[in-house]
Amino acid sequence: MTMQEAADRADVIVAGYAYTVQDGYIEVVDLNDLSKRAVIQNGDVVESLMSDEEDDMVLRYYNRNKEFLE
């Protein structure tokens, strides 16, 4: 997947992170490094290929913008 493809399929992009609603979870992709991904489910990061700091950051961005994902 290219950065453009990830951005196009995203429901919301916040600070370079693409948030895509899937069935029962939110997929997060760092558009600057497509290998960095996370899964948010029930308000928690449940899977991640990001650092702990990035996990905290994408979760904060999610909580501030989740109304746009509903």
Where are these regions (language model features)?
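A short, structured beta-strand/loop element
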Residues: 14-53
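Mixed-charge, Lys/Arg-enriched low-complexity segments
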Residues: 44-70
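Negatively charged, low-complexity tracts enriched in Asp/Glu with abundant Ser/Thr
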Residues: 1-15
